[in-house]
Structures are given as C-alpha cells and as structure tokens.
Amino acid sequence: MAPSLAVRAASRVESLTRHVVADASGSSLALNPTASNGGVASARPTPGGGPGSLSVVDNRTGKKYELPIEPGGYVPSAALKQITAGGDGAGLRLFDPGYVNTAPCKSKISFIDGDAGVLRYRGYPIETLAETSTYLESAFALVYGDLPSAAQLAEWEQTIMRHSALPVPVIAAIEALPHDAHPMGIILAGLNALSTFHPEQNPALQGGDIYKTHSVQDKQIVRIIGKMTTLAAHAYHRNTGRAPAPPNQKLGYAENFLYMLDAGLDPDHRPNPRLAKALDVMFLLHAEHEMNCSTAAARHLASSGVDVYSAVAGAVGALYGPLHGGANEAVLKMLARIERVENIPAFLDGVKNKKEKMFGFGHRVYKNFDPRAKVIRAVAEEVFSLVGRDPLIDVAVELEKRARADPYFVSRKLYPNVDFYSGLVYRALGFPPEFFTVLFAIPRATGYLAHWREALTDPDQRIMRPQQIYEGPWLREYAPIEGRRDATSDQMWQVEPSNASRRRLAGVVSTHRAGTGDHAAFGRGDVAPLSSATREVEGSDPNRRAFGRGLGPAFSGGVVAGDATSGVDQLMRRR
C-alpha cells in the first residue's frame, strides 16, 4: 500500500486543479445524485431468510399468535404487544440491555457483516475506498448516497473549506477554558457554542420544519465538517499555549489540519503530502460504522428535533467515553508493558489465566478480522517509512501473529480491531494519547451527519422513547420527616468532603466564601490555576508538544520501548 499512497499524494494537487477548473466552468453541485456511480457487483442475500411469519404459543394462556417477519428479516416489536396474559394487561415487551439485538431504524448508509469481516459505505467496500478514494469524497457518498462527479467533488471540497473558520466568540469560549482541559471537552464546548449561532436555522427557534429544506440541511453539514478540524486544532493548541495557524482553504482537508497544527506564523509551510494522505486514510476509515453507541446517540437526540450542532455534540460526548473512543490508548499501554517480542508468550499466558487484559482484539460486531485494521497496518508501515519505525510495531505484529495462530483466541473469534494499530499511527504522527479520541471524532462527525440527514426523511422516525422494566417499590406512603430513620443503603451520600470543608470543620475561618461552593479559594479543588504569565512560559516550551499532565511518553520525557522522542522532534518529523 505504501507506494500507492505516495503516488496518490503526489497526484492530489493535479486532481484538485482539475476539479477547480471544472467548477470555474460553471458546473453546480447537485447534492441529490440520482445516477449510481458504480454498478452493483452482486445481489444481496435475503436478509434473515426473507419475509414470512413466526408462530408463537403462549404457554401461560395456550393462545397462538402469528407474528409477521418483514422482508428485512425482522419482527416488528409492536407485534408483541398483542400477547397478553392478564395481570396488569400490558403486552409483551423485549428486554434487550445494550440494544444487542434491537434495530431502532432502517438505514442505507453503511453495512457490516461481522462474521465475514465486511464493512461497506453505501455499498462500496472500505478497502476499495481506502485505496482509491479520499475522506471528503467518501464523506459525500456517506451523506448523499453516491460518489460525486469531478465537478461535484470540487464544489463539495471548496464549500467545506470555505466554512472552516470559527466565529470569534467560539474561539474566545475555547480560550476561556482551563489550559489543561481535555481536548475532547474543548471539542464539546466548541460544538455547543456553535449551536448558539445562526438562530434562523435552529428548529427550537424557527419551528420543527426548518430542516425539511435541503439547502438548510446542507449548510449545516458543510459547516460542521469544515469546522471540526479547526476546533481540533484549537483544542490541541489550548494545551500548548499557542494559537493555531488560520485555516488554509487552498489545502486539502487533512493537509489543512496538519497545517493549522504546525505552520505557526509561516504561511508558506506545507505538511508532508504522504503524511497528510496517511491521515486522510485514517479519517476515511473512521468516518462511519453504522449503529454504534455515539451514532445511536446522534439519532436519538435528532429524534427530538434538536439542532444538529447539539445532536453532534451529544454524539461526541458518547464517543468521549473510554469504552467507545479510547481503546487505542489502552492498546499502546498494553504494547508498552509487553515491551519486547520475547515477552509475548508470557503475556498471552496471562491473558488465558485472566491475569492480563488484551486490548485491540475482539469487537461487539466483528467475529472476524476487522477490515479497517488491515488497512491501518499498511498505513502504519507508510508512516514509519517517513518518521522512523516505532519498536512497538514489531511487538504488535508478532502479538497479532501468535494470537491468530492460538486456538484459545481463534475459538473465541478474537481478531485485531480498528484500535489495534491506530494508536501506533497517531503516535508516529506526533499526537499524544489524549488527542486520539479527537482524531476519531473529526471524521466520525460525517457519519453522525449522514444519519441525521437520513433520519429527517425517515417515514418511521418518531421521538425515541425506549421502555423500561420497572422493578422498584410498587406503592409507598409518604412519612413525615420527624418519624424517619437514617437511610441504610450503602449507595447513599458518598460525596467525599472537599479540602475547604475539612478546613471549615477544623475551625479555620475562610475569607473566600461567596459563590465558591465547596471548592477551595482557587476554585478548582486543591490545585491552583497557573497565572497567565506561567501559562505563556509553559506554552512556549518547545519540548511540550501537548498536554500539561498525564502526557504520553513521547511528550513528557518518559520512555516507552526505547522511545524518548521529544515533542519538538515530533513536530520536525511531521515536517
């Protein structure tokens, strides 16, 4: 894959030039293509065996019911409501923790066959797109259903880049956050701040029908995709104490992102095109993955009619969770702990004996090799050829090889997933672990937007309101407080006293009372915020490429697997 990456990167400027020429000739962007750009390779097998019916006998009553099986291979859950057996008269419901076998919507955006290890965007295999397409081209297909023509792609790319700048008040809101704020928290704050702009396009202010206009939908889509990298650049540099370079609308999407990170005051700086292409492929691979936790959150929020910025922010908040977006950092820590290839057998024995955890293997959906992991391994080799080989890649490759040959892992269908190699790529590109989830959120915003747009025209769409299985007390009388005893549950009142509370209880008189709550005088527990002068000094230190505390080894002076690369070295690597 490495040679083709270099070739495609070298031809990118020429390709964009052709698109610009086509756009200058007066062509327009048709955002609802009707002709399919790519034939159907084969017919889809009948989902779930096809339509029919399911005969159910309720052994409680002896009654027999016929439940319809729809052409998509599913049973409408509402059909169960007819099954009753006295009691409270309620119909039968499904108990499905985690929505393991529940489909809340129908979608045409992406397809996964977990047993075969298949992922397709709008029918296009992910491997083909990674080899031949770009992130923004694939984003167009995800949002609008088909690959764009040359003229459409040119206008799509240019429109997104024209909307890459942030409003000044949004930048001010970011700069008001703590200097060591987590970058995902900054992304969330930025998206929520953006939701307050353009009130004329907010359904809560203008009525629920405002998004039924395609032009209004499309404007929000290009705005969010365009601004995600700029938000990320500000999140990155909020922690370094420097300002990102302004967006360069003449560059490609991933290229402009690296430019904002590294150009500083040099408007002529250009990122390495091969590194930019590698990052573009990573964006493409992470753009969409059907009904995952954060995408489901986006559709859930959108069902309420909330503005799209709030819906995307809620989805990004779900991605912030360590069980969803933070697994690649855990993989890095695992590989660093193994350290050398000769330690792998002992580590695998520890996994089998439940003494070790193996991250980056297995998936909620895939019971085969995650197709994205294969591509990312090739991208890793391309990046290492430019910036130097990370010794942990040898550990990763050998760990994969031995796990795939071990009956213990094969029988449990534990194969490498997308997180196994992605952290190594991001570390080689000079990003600290705290930023990995941001690099996930940037492209996944496209998937959220595709689902948001699809939900707007879904005839089955209604506000999502799952049911619950109630198991609490049935009916209780209210007791006056004078006659109550102390609650005995071990789950009550677990708040630890703050330092300020301890001082007050010790009899120390605090002069910082009004409006402080239980926090110390500094307002953030027992840690004093840095003065503005201190922040400037820390931010200007060239060896601090990223985040003040809890840095990855390459950014804090620590060593992992022999890598003591400083932050400034990472900057020079990307250049």
Segments and roles (model prediction):
Residues A2-V21, S27-F522, F555, G567-R575:
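Non-transmembrane, aqueous-exposed alpha-helical and coiled segments at domain scale
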Residues R535-P542:
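Hydrophobic alpha-helical membrane-insertion segments
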Residues S531-A533, T565:
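Short, low-complexity, intrinsically disordered N-terminal modules
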Residues E538, F547-P553, G557-G558:
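Low-complexity, intrinsically disordered Ser/Thr/Pro- and acidic-rich segments
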Residues G525-A528, G539, A561:
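Short glycine-rich, low-complexity segments
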